[in-house]
């Protein structure tokens, strides 16, 4: 530790106004000195554990379990603490109890013959485990994580050693009293939640909370209660954010995807979006149309034929509306350079064909009852009325708006954190691997400046309610971020939604990826990106999601000699046959980086009843010889700045530039 040079009085005088404000918080040499000592001590603690998860896609059961077991961290802690002193079945039961304390206790109360003994043994084990997971934090930080009902008792137990002879009776009496007064269950629930909280210091979600899974709103509700979280928006998140902002094209996309996968629970049950007007509209216009190409993909869903027919009609109806709304944006924003996606005017209804890239293709569906061949991108009166009703539903959904505000306040397009660069999709590149220049708002941008600009525009889409022009541009940009050719979230040249519905030729379905994906294994590309984002290439990593890792085909999630890590979570069941696993998560603790691959999760019910955990295997990517400390982190840098400021305050006190408060005044 280097103390502030007292001879630099001119710097202190320049900062005197700020130091006087700081003196309100630390009104004496004694209080400022104590805080410096505390902060300096914190710098020497081990860094907290970071947990990285990506591409959840609404699969709330798998995600909930992953959050509770911290990608196997809790199980490893149990192994570290109890080793061979516990049977494997006991370790498994202890882990399940920590993950799901309320539900597991209900089962144990029904099956355990000597509940009092079980309570005593379990309490000792949980306290011992909690002592270990809390040991890397200050008492103050641990105290803040404790539930108010048991804060004093847990703190006492954590800071006492049960094997110390002089305190053994005191320690044992606390545990016995907890059992005697019938508070053991509540205490077990409380301390299990504390263990869950302390085992991970920071949670990073690298995009795509939303998509086809049935419980995105459940996931966000859980995340909003997390003690420390950041989110890097994914393309599926941004389209929902655009929908909540009132972007009609985004609303149509969100509904279309939900119908495509027969997942209406998030829309209807989660957010109270009224889809009855869409159902009525679809039945009126597509009554005689079987909408064969719009049948929902019903993975793990048992739908009757009537439901499938209705969903298919709704699916087709909103798809046509989507293409019309997107056409309006493309025409309104020539700088997006997406004219090739204007396809409705290329349809020859009489011939049943589509003109695409100077070729004529036969349409496999030629029923377009709402299409005006003279003005194909104009909504008819019924469509306009429907879109207005749907938009009102999205804008006035209290829960949706609350969740989207959470995504804005805790999220961004990218994040630099502890020398790592986190983003969901890609950094747009040219074919030669150089950063691609994109013109937006008459500015030519690339790399970091491009992402910074897009981040600001995404916020304007939602928050610029009093500036209609800026808000409209922002909303159009939200749609562009969803499917635009230079979108860092989409990462492809075009989205071939229309072709997949209406053309048989598979070649027209192809979506060419940005050259970024070709260069992901190139260390030079990673170094270029690190330099662009002002990171040290020797000590940094890119942590990326979006594209599932095809482990089944031998693909490795570790790219560019460990500089780039792809952790698409693989939660989405539709991708698991392609990937062969349920994806990857990443743990970054004081010892280094651990990449964990996961097998598919069965269910929360089986986890509770049978103790089934997600089968995982862990690869140590990097192991440091000496543990990383808070000193080596971004938080450490902030603490060092605080220490520097407090040292200046000490000098100001000692030189008489600021007067200390009277000790009596401080006390009373």
From Swiss-Prot:
Q: What reaction(s) does this enzyme catalyze? A: beta-D-fructose 1,6-bisphosphate + H2O = beta-D-fructose 6-phosphate + phosphate
Q: Which GO terms describe its molecular function?
A: fructose 1,6-bisphosphate 1-phosphatase activity
Could you confirm whether the keyword Cell division appears in this record?
no
Give the EC number: 3.1.3.11
InterPro entries (UniProt xref): FBPtase_class3 (IPR009164), Metallo-depent_PP-like (IPR029052)
Q: Return the SUPFAM superfamilies for the record.
A: Metallo-dependent phosphatases
GO:BP terms for this protein?
A: gluconeogenesis
Its needed co-factors are: Mn(2+)
Q: What class of enzyme is it?
A: hydrolase
Pathway in which this enzyme or protein is active: Carbohydrate biosynthesis; gluconeogenesis
Q: What are the alphabetically sorted keywords of the record?
A: Carbohydrate metabolism, Hydrolase, Manganese
Entry annotated with the keyword Manganese: yes
**Database matches in Pfam families:** FBPase_2 (PF06874)
Q: Which family does it belong to?
A: Belongs to the FBPase class 3 family.
Q: What name does the UniProt record give this protein?
A: Fructose-1,6-bisphosphatase class 3
Protein's organism: Clostridium botulinum (strain Langeland / NCTC 10281 / Type F)
